[in-house]
Amino acid sequence: KNVITTAKMAAEKSKKTVVVLDTKTMLDGYYFLKNKDTDIDELKEAASRNYSVEITKAVRDTKIEDLSIEKDDFIGLVNGKIKYAKKSLKEVADAILDDLVTKNTITAVVVSGNEKDEASQKSIEEKLAGLKTANINGNQENYYYYLYIENKDPNMPEIAILTDSVSDLTDEDIEGLPIKVVPLRIDINGELYKDGVEISKSEFWHQMLDNNARIKTSQPSPQDFLNAYNKLFEKGYKKIISIHPSSKLSGTIQAAKVGRSLTNRENDIELIDSLGASLLQGFLVLGAAGKSVRGESFTEIINWVNNFRTKGKLLMIIPDLKYLEKGGRIGKASSTIAGALNMKPILTVNQGEVTVEKKVLGERNAQKYIEKYIERESKKQSIVLMSGWGGTPTELENVVRIYSEVENNPKINSLILNREIGAVIGAHAGPVYGVFIFPRLS
């Protein structure tokens, strides 16, 4: 306790953000260190479901609540409190594991002391059979065993959804949902950052537009995906649906495929090419996660994603083509001619490939084209609209303007508005804005 109090005092004096975790046992600390990359609040909540057990011997007769303890009894402490007392080491270990290991238990850690006996050791092995168990020969004195029993959330769904930062999902989007986001890497003037983790969207745009930084992107490594898949299985998920940007736009899904092949559970991981990116990809992920929470099956969710990914229409305006030219997406001549004529291409995604929907003169005419397209589609059926932007306040103002022209249409329902588009799209396209629409019935 004195150590924790001192640590908290030191944390208050630090200029950096420091979180002091009030652990009760050694294996509490082990659990937090093992999961050090997990969100702190999420980790604290998960730890509250776990049991840290210490088995030792009583040094005197005593009584704790309704538990009578005699000297030399074997006692079991659970999360720092004495809960069990038996005459043999095997008996106390059996009683503890019979009570604490349930259908929600996913992993266990067993640290054996130098006075363990064969009977208790064999019994512990039998009772933990079928669980992922880490056995450590600690050779500690006085404590026969340290046990750590990790449990999943009893209300968690069986299916997790994994994606990457191209989805442009926020922490608020995924809160409470079975979603894991693997960040791509952003190279800014030779310095690598994890997208959305070590660099925010606003900082990326500042570096690109204000500092004229040299920016490149790279997909996660197969090891990144292997680690993410294993983490989800360790949490207790039985299946994973992994949704990523179009293979014609990024090599991310190929890295995920290699990562999947390195697991021993390939049949439990379904890889899906979203045939798009950003707004479309993010919506597929949110939709799939919602279906998982509602208890829909692995096959049902996969079929929905595969069917829906071709239902929508993405329309994006790129005000300045120089970024596409710098990235080699278009030639310098095309960029120069388009600039001289004030030509504004409206881009879409068709079967996973970026194509030109329409070329118009002037940015306002490009906006009007999108507005008319939305109105035309709404006459056929009710539609849902999402909008996004990236770059400067001008792009935000323009996408707000597009929506303001159609928002009073009773057949148009908004879902996500003014979503900021991040580094992966922005690094190649520069400032950008537009909409994604799809039939409401889908």
Regions found by a protein language model. Give the residues of each.
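N-terminal glycine-rich anion-binding loop in soluble enzyme alpha/beta folds
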Residues: 160-221
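Conserved GHKL (Bergerat-fold) ATPase module
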Residues: 1, 8-20
